[in-house]
Amino acid sequence: MRDHEPSIWKGMIAGLAGGLVASWTMNQFQAAWTRIAEGTEKSHGAQSMQPSEGSHGEQGQDTAEQDDATVKTAKVISKNVFGHELQESEKEPAGAAVHYAFGTVTGGLYGALAEVTPQVTTAAGLPFGAGFWLLADEVSVPLLGLSKGPTAYPVSTHVYSLASHLVYGLTAELSRRAVRQVL
C-alpha cells in the first residue's frame, strides 16, 4: 500500500513529472504506431489530433480545416493571449507544446488525486488512461468543436487513440509512483 504520509503537493509534483514522461512516451508510441501503420512519422495524435473536417492533406482543403485539436488550441491561445497569429511553421511546435502542457497538467491533477484517493492508481494507471481518453478525445474535443464527433472516425482511429491513452496512463502511474517514493 502506501509507505508515506499523504501530501497533495508532493503528489502533484510527482504527477507533473509522471504526466510529462507519459506525454513523451505517448508521443513515441504514436510515432511508432504511425510508422508501422502508414509508413509516416507524424506523431502526437489521437482522435484529438485528427483534422476536424475532411481528410489528411486533401487537395484544395483549407489548412485551417487540416489543423488538429492541439494546433487549433495553440492558435486560440497565441491569438488571444499573445496577440500573435501562428505562422504555418509555428503550428507543429505549438501543437506539441499544447499536447505536453495538457498531459503534464493532467498528470499533476492525477498525482494530487492519488494522494487523497489512492484507488485511482488501481491497475497501474490503465483505468486512468482509459478515462482520460474517454473524457478528452471522445467527449471534450468534439464538444469544443476541435474535431469531428466520434462517429465520424473509423474504429481503427478509436483503437489507436485508446491504446495511446492506455500507454499514457500506465506511464503516468509508474513514473508518478517512482517520483513519489523519492519525495
Model-predicted regions and their roles:
Residues 1-183:
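Short amphipathic, positively biased membrane-proximal segments
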